[in-house]
Amino acid sequence: MFLSSYENKIDKKGRVSVPATFRSHINSMGYNGFITYPSFNHSALEACSQDRIEKLSNTIDSLNPFEEKRDFFATSILSESENLQFDTEGRVSFSEKLLKHAMIKTNVLFVGLGKTFQIWDPKNFDKFKIVARKKAYQNRSNLKWENKQKGELS
């Protein structure tokens, strides 16, 4: 899983080190990089494994091929996606287009979200986190536990 948040600086060549725990998780799935695309909801980037983007692509493909919404999703997600590969030191290079969307200038914040992660400008994420915590608190009763499995703690 992708957990926690890590801030790293973009170097002079435009590369940024991906957190070791994120790289390790991605490598454990058999990949040497990740897919990223502009978020619909935020000035941030969504990031996931190849398997996850294929699942998303299959979901889009399941829509009627002649409906506009299928084209909207495919254009907004798949055509905007980039496959970023780790270099020998675990760094990636983001395109200017992606950095511009996320309003990232010098530092990058990798934010773990479980099966996926996001990439933010740290200051923008700080603002979002305040709102997110407030809304999570307001909606806390909607978060239901699955049936407890043998040996699990409450």
Give the label of every model feature segment.
Residues M1-E7, K12-R15, T21-L84, T88-E89, ...:
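Flexible "stalk/tail and boundary" regions
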